[in-house]
Amino acid sequence: MIERFISEVPRRIWGEKAPHRSRFGEAEFNVASWIRFEHSRGPLKLMIHHEDEAGEHLEVVDSTGAPGDGNALLSGVVRVRFTGKVKAMRVLLGVSDPEVIWSVDELYVQRRGTPVARENKLISGF
């Protein structure tokens, strides 16, 4: 699977659940993205990637077979476990073929359990 960068997730979204005094932390995130694709020959995967003191981690949010040309809404809830200081969190698209042409129409990331407010979620129209 080839990983393609979609977006950084701002610290204001994941930072509250990152460990402070304890060494470990955990949080769940609602993630959704509307993806357009052309020339796909295999699956597409929406993924959350984060880096912490234990290394790099990758969680699959959702996937689709995605043959040919079209679009797909990929969405789900992902649980992220943090170890020590968190460096970054990103949204990635996994593609099986380097020839796939893709674009993101919309992206949504929100930590579960937070009040509905603009500062608590990443909503992007590309």
Show the residue positions of the predicted features:
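Extracellular and organelle-lumenal recognition/adhesion modules and their flexible linkers in secreted
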Residues: M1-F126
